[in-house]
Amino acid sequence: MIDRFGRPLEDLRITLTHACNFECFFCHMEGEEGDNYLLSKEDILLVAKVARKFGINSVKLTGGEPTLRRDLVEIVRGLKQLGYEDVSMTTNGFLLKDLAHKLKLAGLDRINISLHAVSRDTFKKITGVDAFDRVIEGIKSAIDVGLVPVKLNFVVNRRNREEAFKFIELSQNLGVNEIHLIELHPVGLGKLAFKEHDDLREIEEYIEKISIKKLIRKKHFRPRYVLPSGLIVEVVKPYANPIFCAGCNRIRLSVDGKLKTCLYREDNVIDVLDILKGEYSEDVKEELLGRAFMIAIAIREPNFKYKI
């Protein structure tokens, strides 16, 4: 499906929970501000089933922290049974050492792991948890079981910017495939923490100097730098960036049952909770959800647009 701005809809992001065992001060919560209402596994898979009918072939599980869902493995297995070619997840890695193998067997294809520091002290200051070593073990487990590409997310801010350069070195030593250096943006808790925002220009200039090739990612048109080691460094600057929005191919299912068409907005959402919890047959629910998707696609628009 193509929206009225010519952007294809290819990716479904599902927030499994708002609960998290970390307390990162800038968490964007997938742009959601509603209650932590947990959709059932059946609800999630029904929405995902309808999304497949619209040509969506990629799904990412997010949170909060998705590994806190006890039915996570079953959800992953169900998504693969629906025919999704690409099932991925973003996690803080705390529980990954014990879950990586089970998730791989269930069909998880790849994984993003958040690691916003390279030292225990900075890690604890950012997350509120002394778990740096445990997350490193989770990363190693993901690599060992073949959840590739393993990507690490590093949100750059004033509290950790000096570690961004060392983060590149650590990532190469760990053997991960790719890292994302992400600009802090004012969504979720990031609204309150935006004073900690730090410009990525100096870091990107350094990466460009040491890289052997520069690429542009089709999704969001992000710059990607290939280092001599083979590590790919992607620079993510979404805020006030029309280029980022022009390449957006996502729709989100929020934790409280809304189809969310934009990370930055709460006014253009379609509430499907009543459909999911209503006393309808599954066929009727699918039909109603299909209509909801059509409306969501119709109202979808870039938050940041080029000024003409």
Curated annotation (Swiss-Prot):
InterPro entries: Aldolase_TIM (IPR013785), Elp3/MiaA/NifB-like_rSAM (IPR006638), MoaA_arc (IPR013485), MoaA_twitch (IPR010505), MoCo_biosynth_MoaA/MoaC (IPR050105), rSAM (IPR007197). Its EC number is 4.1.99.22. GO terms for molecular function: 4 iron, 4 sulfur cluster binding; cyclic pyranopterin monophosphate synthase activity; GTP 3',8'-cyclase activity; GTP binding; metal ion binding; S-adenosyl-L-methionine binding. Signal peptide: none annotated. Keywords: 4Fe-4S, GTP-binding, Iron, Iron-sulfur, Lyase, Metal-binding, Molybdenum cofactor biosynthesis, Nucleotide-binding, S-adenosyl-L-methionine. Binds 2 [4Fe-4S] clusters. Binds 1 [4Fe-4S] cluster coordinated with 3 cysteines and an exchangeable S-adenosyl-L-methionine and 1 [4Fe-4S] cluster coordinated with 3 cysteines and the GTP-derived substrate. [4Fe-4S] cluster 2 binds at residues 245, 248, 262. GO terms for biological process: Mo-molybdopterin cofactor biosynthetic process. SUPFAM superfamilies: Radical SAM enzymes (SSF102114). The keyword Transcription does not apply. It catalyses: GTP + AH2 + S-adenosyl-L-methionine = (8S)-3',8-cyclo-7,8-dihydroguanosine 5'-triphosphate + 5'-deoxyadenosine + L-methionine + A + H(+). Its cofactor is [4Fe-4S] cluster. It is an enzyme of class 4 (lyase). Pfam families: Mob_synth_C (PF06463), Radical_SAM (PF04055). The keyword 4Fe-4S applies. S-adenosyl-L-methionine binds at residues 64, 114. Residues 4-222 form the Radical SAM core domain. [4Fe-4S] cluster 1 binds at residues 20, 24, 27. GTP binds at residues 13, 60, 90, 151, 250-252. Pathway: Cofactor biosynthesis; molybdopterin biosynthesis. Belongs to the radical SAM superfamily. MoaA family. Catalyzes the cyclization of GTP to (8S)-3',8-cyclo-7,8-dihydroguanosine 5'-triphosphate. This is Probable GTP 3',8-cyclase. It comes from Saccharolobus solfataricus (strain ATCC 35092 / DSM 1617 / JCM 11322 / P2) (Sulfolobus solfataricus).
